[in-house]
Amino acid sequence: MARGEGAEQFSSGLLPTAKSVTQNEIKMVKLPKQQERKRALTVWSKVCFAIGGAPYQITGTALGFFLQIFLLDVAQLNPLNASVILFVGRAWDAVTDPTVGFLVSRTPWTRHGRMMPWILVSTIPAVLCYFLIWVVPPIEQGKMMWYLLFYCLFQTLQTCFHVPYSALTMFISTEQRERDSATAYRMTVEVFGTVVGTAIQGQIVGMANTPCKNNTSPNNSSNDLIQSNNSHIPLKSNIFDERCAYMIASAVISLIYVVCAAVLFFGVREQDVQGELKAQKRVSFQKGLRLVMGHGPYVKLVLAFLFTSLAFMLLEGNFAVFIKYTLGFREDFQNILLVIMVSATVSIPMWQWFLCRFGKKTAVYIGITWAVPFMILVVSVNSSLIVSYIVSIAAGVSVGAAFLLPWSMLPDVVDDFKLQNPTSQGHEAIFYSFYVFFTKFASGVSLGVSTLALSFAGYETGVCVQSDSVNLTLKLLVSAAPVSLIALGLLIFMTYPIDEERREYNNKQLQLLLRNEEEEDEMEVLKPDITA
């Protein structure tokens, strides 16, 4: 679609007909100060909103980095069963997103808003299920069903939290600049949440390092006391210690989850933005879904970030195993993961400045491709702890961009949709839930396929050293596959039509519409006095 297309439809259908509206005239519009103050968000509101995003990232990081290795080395499941749990759990999680999005779109407005009740009700059951994911049940035959059940339950309840929270971006302010600022706050806290998740899970579990069996000497009677990185690990006692460590870490994360949800609920006021656009009318979910999925910029944005997200998910899901076995840093893998997340957190403000200065599309190209040389470097050089830390710092910068940019660009697509479909409203949850659906489905595919690939390569549970075929598979999973997916995603992104000029134009038209609606409301209030 050509730049600005759809503006004529918008202006002729909803704006006053007494004066024509051109792009140049719109640029001169100055909103009243009272209206600007109404839409302004305080720093406190932005911080509280941002804190609400931490639980999803804290739990997601812990699951993404550590669940695979927990199922394989602590719960002692075979790789095939672990791959089934990871794939089915993530696939189920993906299916729940459009379902919850539909239910949220049908939720009536309450005194707490439309999104907040979902966030409040889902919190406590979610943390209970999360804790039980990290418990090793005393039954051997039912282990797989135990993890599959509580993993799926947690993902469902987490969706009931995250989809309304994501859509809340459109209900905290009608001002695009305010939403972008709140999104930057949110991304900073969310990436900091990944640091917290990595630190809590990694450092607590790292105190009870995973025991392993000496697979090079199967007839050696000292297998229960093996040497790993110059330290002796008693096998049975350490398995028990590590199980306790995982439960302690999950309990701490569960407590943080509850605190963050409470801060969000009491610190953010959800605005009834839909009431401000009286000219709009609600359409059915099915029609809304067809409109959303038929909106070209949204489809292109989702497809592009689907492939780039899949690349980083492959890296995330396999990097701990890669560090532990291929690089041989059994006692350092949690610290290397922590460095990646700290680097990503520090880079978020820089990327926010960059996208404001050079535009969002440029930020995508630079930010996502930044990681590619380091993905290649980490599998090309000989195993070196110093090189691993350098690569981790550099890769974290790209991870920060991957966190910020999709959520910063989705509101632009929603605004563009509103201008091209001015009589349709209430589809924010559909936009966000289907984006999360596709990324979560990609995550399930990446974890399931990668764990299955390790099974075919001959991965052995609990051993100190894996075979060459396993190490080669891990190199492909953290380097060649992600690089190829990033290239494909960026090729699709080249067709994304919303540049900075179109984004600003859309924003000014929306503000003009809201201004006229508010003026009409004021006239309605004054009308009885005038006629009297």
From Swiss-Prot:
InterPro entries: MFS_2, MFS_trans_sf. GO terms for molecular function: fatty acid transmembrane transporter activity; lysophospholipid:sodium symporter activity; symporter activity. Keywords: Cell membrane, Disulfide bond, Endoplasmic reticulum, Glycoprotein, Lipid transport, Membrane, Symport, Transmembrane, Transmembrane helix, Transport. It is found in: Cell membrane; Endoplasmic reticulum membrane. The chain crosses the membrane at residues 41-70, 82-102, 115-134, 145-169, 177-208, 233-266, 298-324, 336-354, 359-380, 384-420, 431-457, 470-493. It catalyses: a 1-acyl-sn-glycero-3-phosphocholine(in) + Na(+)(in) = a 1-acyl-sn-glycero-3-phosphocholine(out) + Na(+)(out); 1-(4Z,7Z,10Z,13Z,16Z,19Z-docosahexaenoyl)-sn-glycero-3-phosphocholine(in) + Na(+)(in) = 1-(4Z,7Z,10Z,13Z,16Z,19Z-docosahexaenoyl)-sn-glycero-3-phosphocholine(out) + Na(+)(out); 1-(9Z-octadecenoyl)-sn-glycero-3-phosphocholine(in) + Na(+)(in) = 1-(9Z-octadecenoyl)-sn-glycero-3-phosphocholine(out) + Na(+)(out); 1-hexadecanoyl-sn-glycero-3-phosphocholine(in) + Na(+)(in) = 1-hexadecanoyl-sn-glycero-3-phosphocholine(out) + Na(+)(out). Disulfide bonds join 212-464. The keyword Metal-binding does not apply. It is a multi-pass membrane protein. Residues 1-40, 103-114, 170-176, 267-297, 355-358, 421-430, 494-532 are cytoplasmic. GO terms for biological process: carbohydrate transport; establishment of blood-brain barrier; fatty acid transport; lipid transport across blood-brain barrier; lysophospholipid translocation; lysophospholipid transport; maintenance of blood-brain barrier; transcytosis. One of its GO terms (cellular component) is plasma membrane. Belongs to the major facilitator superfamily. Sodium-dependent lysophosphatidylcholine (LPC) symporter, which plays an essential role for blood-brain barrier formation and function. Specifically expressed in endothelium of the blood-brain barrier of micro-vessels and transports LPC into the brain. Transport of LPC is essential because it constitutes the major mechanism by which docosahexaenoic acid (DHA), an omega-3 fatty acid that is essential for normal brain growth and cognitive function, enters the brain. Transports LPC carrying long-chain fatty acids such LPC oleate and LPC palmitate with a minimum acyl chain length of 14 carbons. This is Sodium-dependent lysophosphatidylcholine symporter 1-A. It comes from Danio rerio.
